Amino acid sequence: MSLSIDVTSLPSISSSIFKNESSSTTSTLSGKSIGRSEQYISPDAEAFNKYMLSKSLEDIGPSDSASNDPLTSFSIRSNAVKTNADAGVSMDSSTQSRPSSNVGCDQLDFSLTKGVNVSANLDSCISISTDHKKEKSKKDKSRKHYPRIEADSDSEDYVLDDSDSDDGKCKNCKYKKKYFALRMRMKRVAMQLIEDL
């Protein structure tokens, strides 16, 4: 992946930024930038009034203020210095060290002599496994196999006395043995179901 930074659309930045050759030309920042001193002078109300009265109302805008306090703004502005790209920025500016030029003291000059080159490599590997092991569901695991009940179908020879049906006894039944075995198995299955629940 390659990343390039395009700064040609920014105001007042020359296209020589991407050349690796030194240039003595400087490009001026658009608007008014202030090179401030770390030493603040005490606000001079008389000089501030003279400065503000010398400007028309249309000329006073946001660029005239570097602080919310107008007097502090003026003291910063009076300490501003025009900087040179070769000489650097003076932090201890004084009235004597200010260059005598036609350019105002609220301007900052700069030059960039080195190119900007940003390069980065991005390697990524994604592996997706779609193998799915079929697992037995919990229902299948929890299902218990109950004993299968097998009973032969009764034939027409099956006889049950109506008189004995009330007390649950079968006297004249030829399937009496099979009947009791089946009833015993049914009872066991019913008891197993009740225990599981």
Curated annotation (Swiss-Prot):
Gene Ontology MF terms: ATP hydrolysis activity; magnesium ion binding; nucleotide binding; RNA binding
CC cofactor: Mg(2+)
InterPro entries assigned to the protein according to its UniProt record, in alphabetical order: Rotavirus_A/C_NSP5
Residues recorded as bearing Phosphoserine in the entry: 67, 153, 155, 163, 165
UniProt binding sites for Mg(2+): 92
Keywords attached to this entry: Glycoprotein, Host cytoplasm, Magnesium, Metal-binding, Nucleotide-binding, Phosphoprotein, RNA-binding
Bias type Low complexity, positions: 17-30
Subcellular localization: Host cytoplasm
SS bond partners: none
Protein's GO biological process: viral genome replication
Modification note: O-glycosylated.
Chain intervals for the UniProt region annotation (Disordered): 17-36, 131-167
Pfam family, one: Rota_NS26
One annotated Gene Ontology cellular component of this protein: host cell cytoplasm
Biased composition annotated in UniProt, kind: Acidic residues: 152-165
Protein family per UniProt: Belongs to the rotavirus NSP5 family.
Complex formation: Homodimer. Interacts with VP1. Interacts with VP2. Interacts with NSP2; this interaction leads to up-regulation of NSP5 hyperphosphorylation and formation of virus factories. Interacts with NSP6. Participates in the selective exclusion of host proteins from stress granules (SG) and P bodies (PB). Also participates in the sequestration of these remodeled organelles in viral factories.
Function: Plays an essential role in the viral genome replication. Participates, together with NSP2, in the formation of viral factories (viroplasms), which are large inclusions in the host cytoplasm where replication intermediates are assembled and viral RNA replication takes place. Orchestrates the recruitment of viroplasmic proteins such as capsid proteins to these factories. Participates in the selective exclusion of host proteins from stress granules (SG) and P bodies (PB). Also participates in the sequestration of these remodeled organelles in viral factories.
Official protein name in the record: Non-structural protein 5
